[in-house]
Amino acid sequence: MESPHPGLSDMDIPLNTSLIETMHASPTGEMALLDLHLDRLLRSAQALGFANPPRESIRRQIVEHVACTPLKGSDLRVRLLMGPSGKVALESYTLPPLTGVPLVAISPVRLKSPEPFLQHKTTYRPWYADTMSWLTDHPDFFDLIYLNEKNEVCEGSRSNVYLMQDGVWVTPPLTCGLLGGVVRRQLLASGQVVEKPIPAASLLTHPGQLRLSNGLRGWFDVQLVDFPGKLNRNN
């Protein structure tokens, strides 16, 4: 069967894979980036051959969930899962504020830029499994930044990456191997950021001019430090 997306086919999609959207809801229930989250969710559903439920039906489920959660009145992390059938599941958690300037380091693991699943936010993320465990054990770090086989910056395990170069904020293009984040899309559309490959060496020569973004935290400064130890949490 021909794939609906280059490099993907029915056999390539692991069993029980779901699409994910992780969204911020304000204490008043506002979700400023909801339309961008829905755009990405439905675009990936089509690419992966998932059922594509009506956009307004998904929106209504999200809005009703946020309105009814006992955690409302706080900043929330709202997690949406959608399986191949198009069925949506929602969970909410309180979202603590960031404190200080978060730390990041360069991951010792490399990504392969042609990997098609990098451009879709799904539960199939084996290349990030050790990083997520490591971050749990190292709460001072917000994320690890990944490089690809060309020694170019890709993304963090839960964020997009930006570097100030010659007075302009740049972020890697999707062809470097990364997820198109909702904040990244907003920044590109507004002209605050431009796409350009970022060689790994540039991170080391501009360590104080680095930002990350994601749908929960927005766009924020981080501090690059040396990676401490090994990625495998058992070492």
Q: What does each model-identified segment do?
A:
Residues 1-77, 81-235:
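Helix-start/capping segments and mature chain N-termini
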